[in-house]
Amino acid sequence: MTTSNTSEKIILGIDPGTTIMGFGLIKVKGKTMEFLQLNELQLKKYSDHYLKLKLIFERTIELIDTFNPDEIAIEAPFFGKNVQSMLKLGRAQGVAMAAGLSREIPITEYSPKKIKMANCSGQTICRIQVFR
């Protein structure tokens, strides 16, 4: 999107999960940033893993169709000790990415630490605030 002399970009950020999928939309224009939406999809009440994946896909598509983002930023996989949890998380990430790819939206993965640091302007202590 382009308006006058300053480029405008909408970014959909996704923190995928099978219990809670966090998401936020921002509009960046020059050096200013505007929050469009910050929310979460609660999935804890559903026991069927495949239903959760379907809901993640549908919500991601709904966000894309509503806000028409220029790109998607998604939290990259991290390595944990529980293999089953990692597989479920990987599927959630893949489903969210597939939704973006189906609409031909560029996707960039960021490490969890990089995302937390960006949200806090370099203050590690701020991670607790991001979590809330």
What do these predicted regions represent?
Residues 1-132:
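Phosphate- and other anionic-substrate recognition elements at nucleic-acid/protein interfaces
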